[in-house]
């Protein structure tokens, strides 16, 4: 509902109807739509942080681990339940909930920055400013939700693999041997049209 109508235009009754619940049942779990938005963002960030932790425990080349993190990030962002534009609407949350999300988001950004810095230290990445590189990656990944079409010809997984490959090649050292990701972009029948969506 947040994807289709936007947070401000979506009411609890709309969400209940879409979920096949009565408003009373929905209110049993959430006191308002801001709690639903918080749940979506908090759960998404937990998945992203788990991806960072997993990648940092591995011993393989940093570009390969970075690819794993970025691809996973985008699949979370494009998830029908936890992702979409809901992840970008932090300002819609009450201050107490927003602060919790911002702290967790900052932890994730710091983890991504540390991974890029590790690649630089090992000579596998070229990024004079790892913080800037990490933020540029996050900007590209997060903006994808504004043009991705779930009914389009490419799945979230395919988009995630392709975008991650582009971004990793932007920081990978020329001497680093990165095995290209083979993508089989299966064309699916689109229920909508529009050149700006994929």
Regions found by a protein language model. Give the residues of each.
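Helix-turn-helix
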Residues: 1-35, 39
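Short coil/turn segments at alpha/beta junctions that flank glycine-rich nucleotide-binding fingerprints
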Residues: 4-8, 59, 80, 122
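Short, structured helix-loop boundary elements
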Residues: 12, 34, 38, 42, ...
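Short helix-capping/turn signature of helix-turn-helix
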Residues: 30, 88-93
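Hydrophobic alpha-helical connector segments
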Residues: 39, 53-79, 133-137, 181, ...
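Amphipathic alpha-helical packing segments from all-alpha helical-bundle domains
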Residues: 43-49, 79, 96-121, 131-135
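An amphipathic alpha-helix signature
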Residues: 49, 67, 71, 109-117, ...
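Hydrophobic/aromatic-rich alpha-helical bundle segments in the mid-to-C-terminal region
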Residues: 84-89, 98-102, 120-166, 174-188, ...
